[in-house]
Amino acid sequence: MRVTMSLEALTTEALAAIAAAQDLVALDQVRVQFTGKKSQLAEQSKALGKMDPEERKVQGAAIHAVRETINNALTERQTALQQAALAQKLASETIDITLPGRGQCVGTVHPVTQVQERICQFFTKAGFTVATGPEVEDDYHNFEALNIPGHHPARAMHDTFYFDANHLLRTHTSGVQIRTMETSQPPIRIVCPGRVYRCDSDQTHSPMFHQIEGLYVAENTSFAELKGLLINLLNEFFEKDLKVRFRPSYFPFTEPSAEVDIMDERGRWLEVLGCGMVHPNVLRAAGIDPDKYKGFAFGLGVERFAMLRYGINDLRMFYQNDVRFLRQFA
């Protein structure tokens, strides 16, 4: 009878301690105190071994009942404390849905990329394929194979970024044309977009800029065909019928060569690109017989086209990461 009363008192004390626990840490301390390995309940369980069988049966059942009562109370209190903690957290993190929301920032394609894709799309519709090549180029593909002699100004250190005597950052995408001619048989019809590099930086020049060059090699190409293609490009890109003129010029890799101008709204001629018939030496260097095949080539600056199309007077604005400027092209 003495042990049974002790269990009743233990149960009462444990339930009171459980109810008084104000957080999960305190509740765990109560659990250890009343059901742990060193608790009074554990000591009474050890004492069962010294009792006779009949008494052990009665007291064992009583101890089990007390343990179950305490564990149930612990579980209920734990659930209540967890719910209270969650409610408190939700209350402290409540969002005022009456406040104005923040607009979603929407990204867009960079204007230079937009212009490059627009130009490439024109040429792919005309039957050209897009070809790419390395930006770190060797001297042969960047200069030698393009009929650019060793004394040419473009080879000077102040115009070209050199890694060593034979490797450099390409100054144009013409090297892609040479590599394509070396590995393909005519007819060849490609455009070569990409980044190019020159030692130049001012309002209309950048050390890094984008070019698109084109090449068409076949048995019966002509300057008239080149002229018609480029006039169609300019009219479609600027979405108007432009006055276009072809001025005689000089490029080492084309002969004859021309620069192409368009007339603006004020009646001024603006240079937009260069072109010409591929020089026989260039065809020969790529392993193509110039007596059998002819070709024409052209090259334009993507930023130049973008500036003319959108009325931008400083090329550097494209690369200043000013969202106010770039947002206009979204």
Curated annotation (Swiss-Prot):
It is an enzyme of class 6 (ligase). GO terms for biological process: phenylalanyl-tRNA aminoacylation. Keywords: Aminoacyl-tRNA synthetase, ATP-binding, Cytoplasm, Ligase, Magnesium, Metal-binding, Nucleotide-binding, Protein biosynthesis. Pfam families: Phe_tRNA-synt_N, tRNA-synt_2d. SUPFAM superfamilies: Class II aaRS and biotin synthetases (SSF55681), tRNA-binding arm (SSF46589). Its main location: cytoplasm. It catalyses: tRNA(Phe) + L-phenylalanine + ATP = L-phenylalanyl-tRNA(Phe) + AMP + diphosphate + H(+). Binds 2 magnesium ions per tetramer. GO terms for molecular function: ATP binding; magnesium ion binding; phenylalanine-tRNA ligase activity; tRNA binding. One of its GO terms (cellular component) is cytoplasm. NCBIfam families: pheS. Belongs to the class-II aminoacyl-tRNA synthetase family. Phe-tRNA synthetase alpha subunit type 1 subfamily. Tetramer of two alpha and two beta subunits. HAMAP family: Phe_tRNA_synth_alpha1. This is Phenylalanine--tRNA ligase alpha subunit. The lineage of its organism: Bacteria, Pseudomonadati, Pseudomonadota, Gammaproteobacteria, Moraxellales. The gene is pheS.
